[in-house]
Amino acid sequence: MRIDKNLPNYLTIARIMVIPVIILAFYINNSLARKLGALLFVLASITDFFDGYIARKYNLVTSFGKMFDPIADKLLIGCVIIMLLKKDNVDEIPCLLILAREFLVSGLREFLALVKVSVPVSRLAKVKTFLQMFALSILILGSKGSGIIYLDIVGEIILWIAAFLTIITGYSYFKACKKYF
C-alpha cells in the first residue's frame, strides 16, 4: 500500500486546525453543538494515534512531525482545558496540574534535545494521554450535551486519574535532566 509521505504531518496539522471549531461548537452551548464539539475532539484525539503509527510503520518520520506532534497534542488538550475552566464548573486542580506538567515537560524535552538526550515516550505516558483525551471528551459533552446527569462527575474522576499519571510520567523527564542541574 502506498501512503502519501506527508500524511502523518497532514493529520498533525488537521488536529491543530480543528481546535477553533471545537471551541466554537462548545460556546454555541446547545446539545447538538456539544455533541459535535465532543465528536470533533474525539476525532482529533484519534489522529494523535494514527499520525505516529503511520509515520513509524511506513518510515515517514519527519523533523516536522517530531516537533509539531507534541505541540498539536498540547494545544488541543490545553485549549480544551482552558475552555472548560472558563465555561464549565470543572475542578481547577487536575486541570492546572496537567497544564503545568505539559509546559514543563515541553521545556525539558527541548533542553534534552539540545544536549542530545532522548527520553522515549513510555507506555504509561500513552495511557496518560488517552485518559486526558477521554476525560476531556466526556467533559466537553457533559451533562448539558448528553442528558446523562452524572457524566460530568465521571469525566472529573477520569481527569483526576489522568492528572495523577501526568505527574508520575513527568518524573522521567526530570530524572533525565537531573545530571544537568
Curated annotation (Swiss-Prot):
Highest rank taxon of the organism: Bacteria
UniProt xrefs under Gene3D superfamilies: 1.20.120.1760
GO terms classed as biological process: phosphatidylglycerol biosynthetic process
Localization (cell): Cell membrane
Predominant location category: membrane
Keyword ATP-binding: no
GO molecular-function term, one example from the UniProt record: CDP-diacylglycerol-glycerol-3-phosphate 3-phosphatidyltransferase activity
Pathway terms, separated by semicolons: Phospholipid metabolism; phosphatidylglycerol biosynthesis; phosphatidylglycerol from CDP-diacylglycerol: step 1/2
Record-listed E.C. numbers: 2.7.8.5
Reaction(s) the record says it catalyses: a CDP-1,2-diacyl-sn-glycerol + sn-glycerol 3-phosphate = a 1,2-diacyl-sn-glycero-3-phospho-(1'-sn-glycero-3'-phosphate) + CMP + H(+)
Membrane topology term: Multi-pass membrane protein
Keyword annotations from UniProtKB, A to Z: Cell membrane, Lipid biosynthesis, Lipid metabolism, Membrane, Phospholipid biosynthesis, Phospholipid metabolism, Transferase, Transmembrane, Transmembrane helix
Gene Ontology CC terms: plasma membrane
Keyword Lipid metabolism: yes
Pfam families for this protein: CDP-OH_P_transf
TM annotation in the entry: 8-28, 35-55, 64-84, 148-168
Function: This protein catalyzes the committed step to the synthesis of the acidic phospholipids.
Family listed: Belongs to the CDP-alcohol phosphatidyltransferase class-I family.
Protein name according to UniProt: CDP-diacylglycerol--glycerol-3-phosphate 3-phosphatidyltransferase
Native species: Rickettsia felis (strain ATCC VR-1525 / URRWXCal2)
Taxonomic path: Bacteria, Pseudomonadati, Pseudomonadota, Alphaproteobacteria, Rickettsiales
Name of the gene: pgsA
